[in-house]
Amino acid sequence: VNNELSDADRFFALVAAAQAGDIRLTSIQAGLLVAAELGIARDSRAFARKLGIAHSLVLRELNDLAAREGVLEIVKRDPRTMRVHYTLPPASAS
């Protein structure tokens, strides 16, 4: 029996864990956070393409997430392509 998780299995396990930690997160929002943390995708189009999700859905979820204080930061918006670059905020020194 192979005990190693595939990259996809690991990603979805982390998404589920993120949702368990914050019940307000949708699966797409949790995916955006995990993708940013793992360096899988740091812009909306890359995330949409890699997961096979419509870019418009990703943009809606990304904007909702960015509206929450301290969860995700919008770095740049490209008005021509609608691509939104994002990052996780720096970890607080608590």
Predicted regions, residues:
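Short alpha-helical segments that sit at the start of domains
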Residues: N3-G31
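Short, structured secondary-structure boundary patches
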Residues: N3-L5, F12, L62, R77-M82
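Short, cationic-aromatic polyanion-contact patches
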Residues: A18-T26, D43, E73-S94
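Short amphipathic alpha-helical interface segments
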Residues: L25-I40, R45, R49
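Short loop/turn and capping residues at structural boundaries
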Residues: A46-F47, L59, K76-R77
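Short amphipathic alpha-helical interaction segments
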Residues: I53-R68
